[in-house]
Amino acid sequence: MAFSGALTITDLDDFLTPSQACIIPVRNNKKPAEDEGPTEIHIDSNNNYYEVSTYPSVGHDDDIGNSKKALEKAEINLNDCLACSGCITSTESLLITMQSQNEILEFIKTNPTVVDPESPCHKPRLPILSISPQTLASLSAAYATASSRPPIPLLVLLRRIRAFLSQPEKGSWRVWDTTFARHMSLRESVVEFHERKDKKEKGKAAEMPMLASACPGWVCYAEKAQGDMLPLLSAARSSQGIIGALAKSWYGHKLQHKPDEIYHVTAMPCYDKKLEASRSDFYSSLYSTRDVDCVLTTGELDLLLQELGFDPHVPIANESTPSYSATEDSPFPELLTHEGSSSGSYLQTIIHDVQRSHPNPTRIITREIRGSTDNIEYLIQDTITGQVVFKGAKVYGFRNLQNLVRKVAKETGIGRSGRGAGAGKLSAAVAARRRKAKTAAPAATSATTSAEGTDVESIASLSLVSGEDKKLDFVEVMACPGGCVNGGGQMKPTVPTPSAPEAMEVDEEGYQRPLPDDGVAVAVNGGSNNVGTGTVAGMEEGMRWSTKEWVAKVEDIYWTGLPTPPASPPLTASNVNGFAPQVKTNGTTNGQVNNGVDRNLQSDQLAEEIIHEVCGDDASKRWDFMRTRFRKVESDVLSSGGVTHEAVKW
């Protein structure tokens, strides 16, 4: 099982032998009495523990049992484990074995499909499965590779899975996708961004830049190792957090089901989502249930479907007919598209909002940091004044994430306990480079104004120079290289088994020694495998479970397999799927919306209706329904020795 790199390397090495023994001592805050003598621990027949004094009490010389006291039971739950910097790094499988396809199979066997006449008050739990679009894209790529057939469009695959799992013998599941929940998450991110921006403009202390928090691996790392930066994290719930609230709080209420009468499962691209679902903010103490009862990775969903006998290539009726409004099968519009990235499009959504609200025309200028497509800065420039009005970034992968932490710490002063000896020289060198670039700026400006047309490269160069001093406003952060389509729980490329002797590595003595590969060795689209070398053609460092070619294939299916794909996945200056005011749409045919923009407008209206039904005018309820909180983890192991997470050197 593969947790994100941000999670697995935090605060402890991975050289521990896997064990279920907890390294955190269980403390009792009750101080012992000064006159207490020696005691013993006795266990009765019911496994209750008692503390018994070994000396008779005064007035009871012959009775030792009169001082027996029942001991409080010590418990360690999953939240305690998440607050620990120990076994989670070496025994992840022990932590998440309860969330797997085996639990779903057991639920299908034990959950009654009809109400028992002898106990009519006991309702069968309503099963709901919410599938992420990244999961659908990965499954489609795997099915296409295994069968040598064209990839199955995401809408078709979603409906085939729904038709299969809705059968009574399979559990009578309601199967949704999570794109509407993502739509609500994006809307809330825009609202929160404006709140922070308004505070900053009013001269108040604002938590900027705003850092996306949809990636649980990044959140876990921030809570454990970068606690001072938690105020910068967006409080908007992720798509999983919102779909869980929708299933238990809104949909269940409409069907007159209590939250504990719904069994909600999500299928996500990474294992870290299992940890997100266990957070206390997503738990109802009133009904003793979580918003998401079980999280399956893409690979686990595939195993579940295999166990149940699913054939992805069996067609069903009306499987490719678009249906943009809510239906009996899904209370939300299916597979909404949000242009930008396959990791949620958080940055693109903010960019669209900034462009739409700015009074003058703007252009977007991008810059790859060190030539990496996983670390890109985006500048929005006013084309009239030349001012850079927004600076954002897309940061994927733990190496880039660490650089982001240092950059944000430098810009904000957050979490900077000290500076190294070479920090001053480095800052001086950067400042000198900026001054040199600025002195050359007037000549470039005059050249562009005197020539006919627009020198795009010169304008971009000038904008980058002016953007050097501009601080970041928003960052889309993901722990996995390549983003969510390359999550650790996604389907892996098929590993060819070398059978011919010439396909194996030969050592100095002539013996065949196929060395184990550190990662997945696969050739995609005609590529070649380097068997036994430990590397794969096209593999980027950090992509331990996949290759660039495989991720590109899943990415392509993600965009082309949607019912109404945008013009192109990359960021553009046009607002194709931006959020617009709540207005009635007129572009309908037979009651159905006919384009992506109108679908999102319709989704805006539905989102507002849902929020009003659940929360009314209560701002506190709305906050709890749409947002979450983050908590700095104080490690008992490190802090007890006087060492903090921030002081650990790697």
Curated annotation (Swiss-Prot):
Pfam families: Fe_hyd_lg_C. Transmembrane segments: none annotated. The keyword Glycoprotein does not apply. It comes from the Eukaryota. [4Fe-4S] cluster 2 binds at residues 215, 270, 480, 484. The keyword Zinc-finger does not apply. One of its GO terms (biological process) is iron-sulfur cluster assembly. Gene3D superfamilies: Fe-only Hydrogenase (Larger Subunit), Chain L, domain 3. Keywords: 4Fe-4S, Iron, Iron-sulfur, Metal-binding. [4Fe-4S] cluster 1 binds at residues 22, 81, 84, 87. One of its GO terms (molecular function) is iron-sulfur cluster binding. Component of the cytosolic Fe/S protein assembly machinery. Required for maturation of extramitochondrial Fe/S proteins. May play a role in the transfer of pre-assembled Fe/S clusters to target apoproteins. Belongs to the NARF family. This is Cytosolic Fe-S cluster assembly factor NAR1.
